[in-house]
């Protein structure tokens, strides 16, 4: 396959530390291209890229371009960005992130994973299955894969696994041989305009695969199932918990360390079925069993031996900020999770219940005013598996506030719909005291959101420990 010439010159990434941009930059660098970039602030991704040998400037300034011959931007970068303006003035090509990802994908046979939820975990699981089979895949993911310590991996094999971003429609540019759709829920309607237009985008995503490829679709989701009649000219494999799935999980047994399940394979044309011996997945929640089924379906189609499938799942180490345990203090378990859509929040809280939690305390930081406004009713009804809910201020992610759409509106909305215990968080500084007062041994404290709440989740175990020790010392002094 024909690749971009290494002589193309230095490639400059505006916003290089973004989770989508950093993976592409890292793989290009490892392939031998000259890569540099800029970002607004110091963070873990900046440090990781610098450690890999990629220069990163802090702040956006025309001077950061240096001798760059190509500039890569995401849709989050505004047209008036000084580096973008300087590139256009110098007639340097300005390339969208998805276009550059598409160029990378032309170097390999590619698997693209799309969907509203579960993309990052499914991408990681597919990568684990292909790696376990000795196929040495290249991987570009939307989250940090714990086994790699990064969101990107340059492999020497013929396959690439990528997370496909539907938020701006750019996944339609990706030249995939295998397409996965995990689910479809209303999201990013600022781009799509309507749920119907979004579903049409997913149909096009699947339709773009070549005749020698195939699509893997989660039949459990009504929106995904609705697509099937329109895709009858393509090779389709369905998966899920439904009896109608080609690759189906049965006899799911959950414990605090994960799930064990059998897999029933159905060949619709031949009319045959077979059941694989039980699989073990060290992740909580039926939604993660569904994610694993997508990887199993791809592995079966690619003739990965069953023993390798089983080993890959059993040894899977997860993804950062996907039900990540940050600590346990006095029997209280603290979880950090990226979930910020009502469907994700409900699935994560259900998983905490499946883990055997005595009670579940949800700490929720709504992400973006527009999302809270668009999905307000869903936010008000997605937390029933939490015995107690603490609601923080909205993380704006650059948005302006919307009157009547804020922390207090969500608190009142939850109460009005019958939730028995909902309180607001005045400041992150008060979180540890609130948790110390309401949590007991055996409880799970689940911190949910795509914003700064991850920092609170990381700090909370030590803060709780300090409060407990202070209380003990005080009690000892009174004797």
Swiss-Prot record:
This protein's pathway: Cell wall biogenesis; peptidoglycan biosynthesis
Keywords carried by this UniProt record: ATP-binding, Cell cycle, Cell division, Cell shape, Cell wall biogenesis/degradation, Cytoplasm, Ligase, Nucleotide-binding, Peptidoglycan synthesis
First-listed, main subcellular location of the protein, grouped into a coarse class: cytoplasm
GO terms for MF: ATP binding; UDP-N-acetylmuramate-L-alanine ligase activity
Sequence similarity: Belongs to the MurCDEF family.
Function as written in the Swiss-Prot or TrEMBL entry: Cell wall formation.
Protein name in UniProt: UDP-N-acetylmuramate--L-alanine ligase
């Amino acid at each position: 396959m024909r690749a971009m010439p290494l002589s193309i010159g230095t490639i400059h990434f505006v916003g290089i530390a973004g989770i989508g941009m950093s993976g592409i930059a890292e793989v290009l660098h490892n392939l031998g291209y000259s890569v540099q970039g800029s970002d607004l602030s110091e963070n873990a991704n900046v440090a990781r890229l610098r450690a890999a040998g990629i220069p990163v400037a802090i702040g956006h300034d025309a001077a950061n371009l240096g001798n760059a011959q190509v500039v890569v931007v995401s849709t989050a970068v505004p047209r008036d960005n000084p580096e973008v303006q300087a590139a256009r003035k110098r007639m340097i090509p300005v390339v969208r992130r998805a276009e550059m990802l598409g160029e990378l994908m032309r170097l390999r046979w590619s698997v693209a994973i799309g969907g509203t939820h579960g993309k990052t975990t499914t991408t990681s699981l597919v990568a684990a299955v292909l790696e376990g089979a000795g196929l040495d895949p290249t991987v570009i993911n939307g989250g940090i894969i714990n086994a790699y310590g990064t969101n990107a991996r340059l492999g020497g094999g013929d396959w690439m696994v990528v997370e496909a971003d539907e938020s701006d429609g750019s996944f339609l540019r990706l030249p995939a041989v295998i397409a996965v759709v995990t689910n479809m829920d209303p999201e990013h309607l600022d781009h799509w305009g309507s749920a119907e237009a979004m579903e049409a985008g997913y149909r096009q995503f699947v339709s773009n695969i070549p005749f020698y490829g195939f699509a893997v679709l989660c039949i459990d989701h009504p929106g995904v199932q609705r697509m099937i009649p329109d895709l009858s000219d393509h090779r389709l494999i369905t998966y899920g918990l439904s009896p109608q799935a080609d690759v189906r999980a049965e006899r799911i047994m959950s414990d605090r360390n994960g799930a064990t399940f059998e897999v029933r394979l159905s060949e619709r044309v031949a009319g045959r079925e077979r059941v694989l011996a039980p699989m073990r997945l060290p992740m909580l929640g039926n939604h993660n069993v569904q994610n694993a089924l997508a990887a199993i379906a791809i592995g079966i189609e690619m003739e990965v031996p069953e023993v390798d499938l089983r080993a890959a799942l059993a040894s899977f180490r997860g993804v950062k900020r996907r039900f990540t345990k940050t600590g346990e203090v006095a029997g209280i378990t603290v979880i950090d999770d990226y979930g910020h859509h009502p469907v994700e929040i409900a699935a994560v809280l259900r998983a905490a219940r499946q883990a055997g939690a005595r009670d579940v305390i949800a700490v929720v930081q709504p992400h973006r005013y527009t999302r809270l406004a668009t999905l307000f009713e869903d936010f008000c009804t997605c937390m029933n598996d939490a015995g107690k809910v603490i609601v923080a201020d909205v993380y704006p992610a650059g948005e302006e506030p919307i009157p009547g759409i804020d922390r207090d509106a969500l608190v009142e909305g939850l109460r009005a719909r019958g939730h028995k215990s909902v309180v607001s968080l005045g400041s992150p500084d008060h979180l540890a005291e609130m948790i110390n007062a309401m949590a007991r041994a055996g409880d799970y404290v689940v911190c949910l959101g795509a914003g700064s709440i991850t920092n609170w989740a990381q700090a909370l175990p030590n803060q709780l420990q300090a409060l407990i020790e202070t209380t003990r010392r005080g009690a000892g002094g009174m004797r």
